[in-house]
């Protein structure tokens, strides 16, 4: 049974901007290198030093639109005139090979991937310890004006946090390493669920028969 390939799981991280999603994912992958990222598809031009299929899959606007129409792109967003999306085939092939995936997606993106892979996806919502702390973290990033920060906080309160009931787990990101360990504990528990290990368990001789 040790040689059997267990189907991988998809851990999807969502939450308000500034709650620390990227830091949590990076810390989790550093502690557990068996976690894998998903290569996204984009309409952005390839840059020097980038490789097809490693950094992104590069498509024209027409090709991207076709992938949306055919359902191959599960979710997508637009930034600075370029589209970025998640490929269904990219996820399917990796979890079939036993790879455990971790993704940072918008709330609508998380719900879309969960709908496409209901038995394989686990959704985790990240909360800040307080709204005041969320504001502080957004200010610390030095990326946005005060008006933009207020808009992000307002969006978190009115649109994002109310969606928390659609997620499987909720983690409050106060101390990064604690949140990382909680996330890894969630992934470990999900790996050990019976429905994810039925084929392996069926190969074990647990009848206890004696001659």
Name these PLM-found stretches.
Residues 74-80, 138-147:
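Flexible beta-alpha connector loops of hexameric P-loop NTPases
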Residues 110, 143-211:
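Small-molecule kinase domains that catalyze NTP-dependent phosphoryl transfer to phosphate-bearing small molecules
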Residues 3-8:
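Phosphate-binding P-loop
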Residues 62-72, 86-142:
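ATP-dependent NMP and nucleoside kinases share a basic, alpha-helical "lid"
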Residues 35, 118-125, 164, 168-170:
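A short helix-turn-beta junction within AAA+ P-loop NTPase domains corresponding to the substrate/partner-engaging
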Residues 15, 20:
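Conserved glycine(s) of the Walker
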Residues 10-12:
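Short hydrophobic/aromatic beta-strand immediately N-terminal to the Walker A/P-loop
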Residues 22-72:
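N-terminal phosphate/diphosphate-binding loop that engages ATP/GTP or pyrophosphate donors
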């Amino acid at each position: 049974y040790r040689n059997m390939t267990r189907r991988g799981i998809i851990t999807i991280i969502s939450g308000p901007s500034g709650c620390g999603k990227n830091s949590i994912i990076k810390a989790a992958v550093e502690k557990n290198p068996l976690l894998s990222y998903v290569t996204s598809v984009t309409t952005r031009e390839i840059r020097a030093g980038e490789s097809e299929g490693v950094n992104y899959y590069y498509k024209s606007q027409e090709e991207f639109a076709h992938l949306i129409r055919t359902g191959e792109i599960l979710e997508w967003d637009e930034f600075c005139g370029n589209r970025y999306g998640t490929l269904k085939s990219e996820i399917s092939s990796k979890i079939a090979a036993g790879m455990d995936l971790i993704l940072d997606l918008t709330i609508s993106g998380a719900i879309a991937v969960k709908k496409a892979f209901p038995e394989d996806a686990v959704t985790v919502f990240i909360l800040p310890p307080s709204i005041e702390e969320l504001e502080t973290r957004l200010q610390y990033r030095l990326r946005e004006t005060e008006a933009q920060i207020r808009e992000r906080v307002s969006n978190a309160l009115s649109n994002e946090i109310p969606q928390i009931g659609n997620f499987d787990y909720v983690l409050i990101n106060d101390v990064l390493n604690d949140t990382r360990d909680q996330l890894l504990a969630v992934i470990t528990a999900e790996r050990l669920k019976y429905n994810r290990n039925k084929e392996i368990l069926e190969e074990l001789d647990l009848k206890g028969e004696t001659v």
